[in-house]
Amino acid sequence: MSNEISRNWPAPAKLNLFLHINGRRADGYHELQTLFQFIDCCDQLDFRVTQTPELILHSNMSAVVADSDNLILRAAKSLQQATSYPGGAEIWLEKRLPMGGGLGGGSSDAATTLVALNQLWNTQLSNDELAAIGLKLGADIPVFIRGFAAFAEGVGERLQAVTPTEFWYLVIAPDAHVSTAAVFQDPLLPRNTPKLGIDTLMSQPWANDCQDLVVSKYPQVAKALGWLLEYAPSRMTGTGACVFGEFSSQQQALAALAKLPSDMQGFVAKGMNISPLIVRLTHP
């Protein structure tokens, strides 16, 4: 068993190009219709297989390591248990994505952990089996495991591959932490958007049902979105706080970024319908 470090496993961010809430289920979860697309801004993970079963996480973000409920460690432990794998792993996380911004960074880190360790441990689970493990940890994890842009329904677990335009995006990360649980519990959240077929959804203007509520409660999000809308069609991703504008070229997105007010943080990224994780898996 090699002690070499397997490097450069990407955990890409995602954008919700639209997000519709169709109702609330008896178990408290919400029925959704959403469109996921990856962007080329990623956290990065390295792994070293160990003979002993311990799972050790290092990170440039001390808050990640201090979190005993960390999704990376939970994902690795779940794969260990599902396969009765006797060894363990040492994991290094370089955190580049904003935390808690609606970009799916934590879910993506967990998905990359499952995919990478499944290969490095040679546990030979299928993508379906990995996605089933991931779904128990978080509704967004399966889309990162499958690695293709997808139309999602249910609580986000029913996925259909799609190929939306791969725009350039200017993503702004407001200085606000939006609680996903609080958004979905808020009585003012719209919950009755009609379910529509994928062809209709793909051809109509896109919107995020959480956006108006979050904008009304978080002035930093309102300010960022208001500024971005002056330059491009723009929306919020997930339950926020990040917002994104669509540009047809990198040059246009960078030109807008150059004008970003000094009290805002942002970056330019390319939309990707195939995850960088899939590229890493097939071209190590």
Curated annotation (Swiss-Prot):
EC number(s) given by UniProt: 2.7.1.148
Domain of life per record: Bacteria
Catalytic activity: 4-CDP-2-C-methyl-D-erythritol + ATP = 4-CDP-2-C-methyl-D-erythritol 2-phosphate + ADP + H(+)
GO annotation, biological process: isopentenyl diphosphate biosynthetic process, methylerythritol 4-phosphate pathway; terpenoid biosynthetic process
InterPro entries: GHMP_kinase_C_dom, GHMP_kinase_C_sf, GHMP_kinase_N_dom, IspE, Ribosomal_Su5_D2-typ_SF, Ribsml_uS5_D2-typ_fold_subgr
SUPFAM superfamilies cross-referenced by the UniProt entry: GHMP Kinase, C-terminal domain, Ribosomal protein S5 domain 2-like
Pathway(s) it belongs to: Isoprenoid biosynthesis; isopentenyl diphosphate biosynthesis via DXP pathway; isopentenyl diphosphate from 1-deoxy-D-xylulose 5-phosphate: step 3/6
Role summary: Catalyzes the phosphorylation of the position 2 hydroxy group of 4-diphosphocytidyl-2C-methyl-D-erythritol.
Protein family according to the UniProt entry: Belongs to the GHMP kinase family. IspE subfamily.
Protein name listed in UniProt: 4-diphosphocytidyl-2-C-methyl-D-erythritol kinase
Originating organism: Shewanella sp. (strain ANA-3)
Phylogenetic classification of the source organism: Bacteria, Pseudomonadati, Pseudomonadota, Gammaproteobacteria, Alteromonadales
Gene it is expressed from: ispE
